[in-house]
Amino acid sequence: MLNTICIYDYGTGNYSSVENALKKLGRKVLISNHMDILKKSDGIIFPGVGSFPTAMNSINKKKIKNQLIRLIKNKKPILGICLGMQILTECSEEISFSKGLSIIPGEIKYNISKKTNIGWKKIHFISSKSKYHSLNNEYFYFLHSLSYKGPIKYQKAITKKTFE
């Protein structure tokens, strides 16, 4: 069981929401961007809210990008929430081109229409073997203008509605 979870602090994010949820689950929560604390934690959460360039600039300024990548590749459990998932990819075109951590192949691109996708849409799981397949054809709320573009094996669910 993951008892001590570190929420990565890149200077922006929904820390308090994530922290409160983890505490309700009985987990010890740390918020940090120091490698010694990240290494000692049982898992790392990269929170959402903020911009890709801001998050990556924070990681690059700390000069820990390579150490962070090694830690993740050595099987440290991680969870990326929204922006946190995005920085795990190779790059993003949000605001300006920025390189990510390259843990997940692919990139974050603006939606074709460049309009924000807002609203309730049905989600379709690509594999019927997904542990979340019972949620197939259920509605989820979306609010984004960027999407992940990468190998199909990293895409677990899609929405088929176009952006209006």
Task: Please describe what each predicted stretch is.
Residues Y8-Y10:
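Short hydrophobic segments within beta-strands
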Residues K28, G43, P77-L79:
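Structural signature of beta-strand start/N-cap positions in the alpha/beta core
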Residues G50-G119:
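Cysteine-nucleophile active-site neighborhood
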Residues V29-K40:
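Short acidic low-complexity segments
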Residues M1-C6:
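Extreme N-terminal starter segment of soluble prokaryotic enzymes
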Residues C91-F163:
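Pocket-forming structural segment of enzyme catalytic cores
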Residues L38-G48:
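Short acidic/histidine-rich motifs immediately flanking catalytic phosphotransfer sites
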